[in-house]
């Protein structure tokens, strides 16, 4: 596991950089503090809790199998933090960003991401004013649950169709990113339906707005996730093989 430590300084520099340089309020994929009505904020939190519990159980088992998994879990969490802190301006006056959940999804499965994702979202809400505490459940459902689950299904399907590993990882990361934004669009569209056209029209409008910047971001995230996974596999082949 000593080889893994070479990644830590770069990850820490990224975390420190985004913590110090992005303290402003964000209007990105993360639904901002106070934006959702209380009943919806509570609803999404209640829906998210079972996934969080299952994720904690899964992580406990992984650590019981091998304590060195802690470092890989931390690396995946840091990868999520750094990528999801990269805010890219959008034509809407908002901004978009990668999610970073594909790496952990491929390595540990989607349940683990529910824990890593909510930890990242909590830190971003407290340190970067990115997202919020009251909207934590809604943001966690989109980025830490539904996105990773969609990505995982796509990854497994791609492997079953004999796609090579890199292509499968790329598709996982890309679809997890897009699924996150589509879920956020649904969450917002349900709460804020179009006065004239209704809920579905509102959802489609949010999706169209996000797609302008999110599709190229998702493609870039897929490529970066492949590079990161291959880098870890090259330095820790036995460890990665064990996780499979």
UniProtKB/Swiss-Prot annotation:
Leader sequence residues: 1-28
UniProt entry tagged with the keyword Membrane: yes
Keywords assigned: Cell membrane, Cobalamin biosynthesis, Cobalt, Cobalt transport, Ion transport, Membrane, Signal, Transmembrane, Transmembrane helix, Transport
Pathway per the UniProt entry: Cofactor biosynthesis; adenosylcobalamin biosynthesis
InterPro entries on file: CbiM, CbiM/NikMN
A GO CC term attached to the entry: ATP-binding cassette (ABC) transporter complex
Spans traversing the lipid bilayer: 37-57, 71-91, 103-123, 135-155, 166-186, 206-226
Keyword Endoplasmic reticulum: no
Subcellular location: Cell membrane
Xref: Pfam families: CbiM
Sample GO molecular function, one term: cobalt ion transmembrane transporter activity
Record-level GO BP terms: cobalamin biosynthetic process
Membrane topology (UniProt): Multi-pass membrane protein
HAMAP family reported for this sequence: CbiM
Similarity comment: Belongs to the CbiM family.
Record function comment: Part of the energy-coupling factor (ECF) transporter complex CbiMNOQ involved in cobalt import.
Subunit architecture: Forms an energy-coupling factor (ECF) transporter complex composed of an ATP-binding protein (A component, CbiO), a transmembrane protein (T component, CbiQ) and 2 possible substrate-capture proteins (S components, CbiM and CbiN) of unknown stoichimetry.
Protein name: Cobalt transport protein CbiM
